[in-house]
Amino acid sequence: MRVRVSLFVLAFAFVFATSAAAQQPEKGYWRAASRTAESITGDISFSGSKITIDFTSFLISPLRLLTPAEVSAAFDEAVDTAGNGQLYRGNIPASRRFLKKNTLCGTQDTQWMAIYVADRSLKVAFFSGDNAPLMTFEALQGSTDLCGTYTFVR
């Protein structure tokens, strides 16, 4: 009986751990892979409700899932192969300087962050502005709120 209970607890823990990881694929440490990431943010990490950039943590809260069409528009991914992404709300002050004294959004506070994880790659787009970004190709092409896109790898 004790072995059966132990197996049940072990199976429950495994299912819980794998479902939590599947719900937050961005969680963990990511190395800068694009030129923008290497020159502005450096490596980043996600842990629960925080993003850490250049050894400074900022609170973020998930708002909604991004559809494959929105991921395609934001990160130039093929719609038929893109998965879901995530839109986060946060506040990274414009006064916060990162690598080489760079900021994320110039003189604007960073308010929004879209992410997309594919295999061992993480793509992040930072946005300023009071309203959530409209994640369509047309809106993003003319957006003054899109601060930049970054690529990271594990």
Task: Name these PLM-found stretches.
Residues 41-85, 123-135, 140-154:
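N-terminal glycine/threonine-rich, aromatic-flanked beta-hairpin/loop signature
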Residues 6-17:
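Bacterial N-terminal signal peptides
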Residues 118-120:
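Residue-level recognition of beta-strand termini and adjacent short loop/turns
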Residues 112-116, 153-154:
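Extracellular/mature segments of secreted proteins
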Residues 66-111:
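Mid-chain, structured segments of secreted extracytoplasmic proteins
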Residues 1-3:
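N-terminal secretory signal peptides that target proteins for export/translocation
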Residues 18-24:
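Sec/Tat signal peptide C-region and signal peptidase I cleavage site
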Residues 25-27, 31-64, 98-113:
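Short, solvent-exposed loop/hinge segments that bridge or flank secondary-structure elements
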